[in-house]
Amino acid sequence: MTQTLSQLENSGAFIERHIGPDAAQQQEMLNAVGAQSLNALTGQIVPKDIQLATPPQVGAPATEYAALAELKAIASRNKRFTSYIGMGYTAVQLPPVILRNMLENPGWYTAYTPYQPEVSQGRLEALLNFQQVTLDLTGLDMASASLLDEATAAAEAMAMAKRVSKLKNANRFFVASDVHPQTLDVVRTRAETFGFEVIVDDAQKVLDHQDVFGVLLQQVGTTGEIHDYTALISELKSRKIVVSVAADIMALVLLTAPGKQGADIVFGSAQRFGVPMGYGGPHAAFFAAKDEYKRSMPGRIIGVSKDAAGNTALRMAMQTREQHIRREKANSNICTSQVLLANIASLYAVYHGPVGLKRIANRIHRLTDILAAGLQQKGLKLRHAHYFDTLCVEVADKAGVLARAEAAEINLRSDILNAVGITLDETTTRENVMQLFSVLLGDNHGLDIDTLDKDVAHDSRSIQAAMLRDDEILTHPVFNRYHSETEMMRYMHSLERKDLALNQAMIPLGSCTMKLNAAAEMIPITWPEFAELHPFCPPEQAEGYQQMIAQLADWLVKLTGYDAVCMQPNSGAQGEYAGLLAIRHYHESRNEGHRDICLIPASAHGTNPASAHMSGMQVVVVACDKNGNIDLTDLRAKAEQAGDNLSCIMVTYPSTHGVYEETIREVCEVVHQFGGQVYLDGANMNAQVGITSPGFIGADVSHLNLHKTFCIPHGGGGPGMGPIGVKAHLAPFVPGHSVVQIEGMLTRQGAVSAAPFGSASILPISWMYIRMMGAEGLKKASQVAILNANYIASRLQDAFPVLYTGRDGRVAHECILDIRPLKEETGISELDIAKRLIDYGFHAPTMSFPVAGTLMVEPTESESKVELDRFIDAMLAIRAEIDQVKAGVWPLEDNPLVNAPHIQSELVAEWAHPYSREVAVFPAGVADKYWPTVKRLDDVYGDRNLFCSCVPISEYQ
């Protein structure tokens, strides 16, 4: 039959690229699970009362090329002015070797959080380097592997200060008046839920205030002044007040380390180490503290440990502090950091080394000195005598200066009374400085850069002598070797090949949705139109961003069944926090602020109770029945017991147990009956899109993990995005922003992230995904995700029982394999299976969550039947190996499972095992071999001997 032109144009071509199994493979799998079609399968599995009659109207699909052209036209509406606004954001020069070999490399950006250290040694080493940079620059003992942004780090510093404070009755937190306004905004939001009083005043007046448990100072103030806080910190420490200092990472190259001045906590943004501004993010924050406070620190910490052979190996240390274990008692609700961005900053430091970084920092400071000298020579007054890269210039005709700046396509900071702020950066040239002279002084200023340079080179007093760093930084060999592009490229490749990412194999992690991050989706994030905008630029310069964000928000509204979407939260955990704050403020607006009880099912992810606690709520756990569903009887009893104090329930759908609960609408009705709100965790949205929606089910608010369902890559542990969808009555209570008015959001609430739209520069990824898939593709993606999970469950259930199923023995988009009977029978654990899968070339499924002794498998729609069969064959082969142990062929203490994973060096070492080398490293004829570089890690050793800085190179050899 002759095809029509429309058929030949094939606007839905990307759908077939994104979805792994083709039509024939889908039919084979449907036959295997006993279903006639995708619609028939989802019709059987999804409760009838929540199935959408028609898919959400998000438009027809577009080809990759058409979508890219459409988005390019939108991006072109952004105006790329040169921004000297500062306030924690500067233009950067990302070295092309890092751009090409990391940011644009799926071997780096498609990896998952390194819970499985044996397949993560490369990015763990890069993160350890990041921690070493942090330690050297801050002068402290312990560093984390990044936080979400500088403002969030400030809020975490406040919370940590309270945890470690010996002044248990003190309830006030002091913030110096010259911290960045967005930092203060986020601190105030967090303080409100904790019940802390925030005092904002001149730093020198801090001792005038009583009952202060912690202080936040900023080493280089928001308008540029360098502060020597040595004496003040000493006085504060004598009064047992915990001192946190916000610092500029580039300034720290030249300035004395706050830790050496006595600070307890030091944090800041690593953005200017090579990460584009991106209209606000994503960026990594650094965070360091004294050794005595290490168990109270938030976020990931990479530690040096040993593997089973006694060799040096890296791992995430002290995970017992974190939300997935401690739940509401966790130090923080954060379950994602900013690994990809931290690693860019880390490798920026490696590539430039201490000499290169000092050259960059000195050049920035020299140009600032030259600018200052010229302006003062012409009679303008600087508000601060001591500065690094930022001048606060008093101007008589401020309107005229700003008009000339706009005409020259320059952004100055304009919110300072009778003055403008100018922040220079590594991209600033002498031509830029001459242009600034013209803007501030007029064209006939007569100044000469070289003459001014000679003057300031011999007589610069803009950094106090006491504030100049007198110690060496970055002395470890890793920062002093890889300075040619060839060496750097090879170093990065050596790290990459240690890790297992989606470019090598499926990552079947339950509750993580490790789907395709298509190249076409990733391309726009490095476009200058998106990458180079300052988050606080005038809104008329960001019309492209505003259009893209508005379109994406509109699509998400339609896909979720909500009335509004807030894009600010820059992780799923931040989304939970923002959604719960919206509920809290809604109740307060109705004079029901006493509603503070949050019901959470026993199966919930640990982030849920941690977020509830952060939001000032009390957690009450609701039981699950023997089938893993919410126990309605217990729910009613707990809701009735809470009564007028019921705030909300947090529920995941499909459930964390991997099934569509039949009674989800009844759950919503019970909570609403008692005046509560329904928070539906969007972690499993990949099984809802196009089939049902949170709003249709009856929920009031959800966060959406754009890094799961909507294709933003996990980056090895971040970035993520967690926008929240809300019903109309909650819309006035979503986060606002003190610096930028968010168009279309009538909210006066505080911010939860530093930038108004969170990590805005990765939103084009989700825009591209939805645009290319269209309504039909999005629904089909959900259906194939469900098919793939059921195919795995049906083929593995005889070897590994599926713990929970719904109607007709079906699962949703993931399934839980119960290893407990096998462990009781043979002694082989889920950990042994997880590590043995590495020998077969796979990342392990999620271990012991949500049920201890299990493996949770989520294949996603992007995996082909060939890859699914490869995984299934590996699992069945492992089951056969377990049977060998059971039969006594291999002893329990010496077999391929308990010794897994196996590494190359074992092949040439003495072999004393009762199984062959071939069985060890080429099981079941594995062809495309992934080689881990370390054996199983010793977790106990790692936590007992915590060491979070770089080790000698010899340890890696």
From Swiss-Prot:
GO terms for biological process: glycine decarboxylation via glycine cleavage system. The keyword Nucleotide-binding does not apply. Its EC number is 1.4.4.2. The keyword Oxidoreductase applies. It comes from Escherichia coli O6:H1 (strain CFT073 / ATCC 700928 / UPEC). The glycine cleavage system is composed of four proteins: P, T, L and H. It catalyses: N(6)-[(R)-lipoyl]-L-lysyl-[glycine-cleavage complex H protein] + glycine + H(+) = N(6)-[(R)-S(8)-aminomethyldihydrolipoyl]-L-lysyl-[glycine-cleavage complex H protein] + CO2. GO terms for cellular component: cytosol; glycine cleavage complex. The glycine cleavage system catalyzes the degradation of glycine. The P protein binds the alpha-amino group of glycine through its pyridoxal phosphate cofactor; CO(2) is released and the remaining methylamine moiety is then transferred to the lipoamide cofactor of the H protein. Belongs to the GcvP family. The modification N6-(pyridoxal phosphate)lysine is found at residue 708. This is Glycine dehydrogenase (decarboxylating). It comes from the Bacteria. InterPro entries: GcvP, GDC-P_C, GDC-P_N, GDC_P, PyrdxlP-dep_Trfase, PyrdxlP-dep_Trfase_major, PyrdxlP-dep_Trfase_small. GO terms for molecular function: glycine binding; glycine dehydrogenase (decarboxylating) activity; pyridoxal phosphate binding. SUPFAM superfamilies: PLP-dependent transferases. The gene is gcvP. It is an enzyme of class 1 (oxidoreductase). Its cofactor is pyridoxal 5'-phosphate. It holds the Pfam family GDC-P.
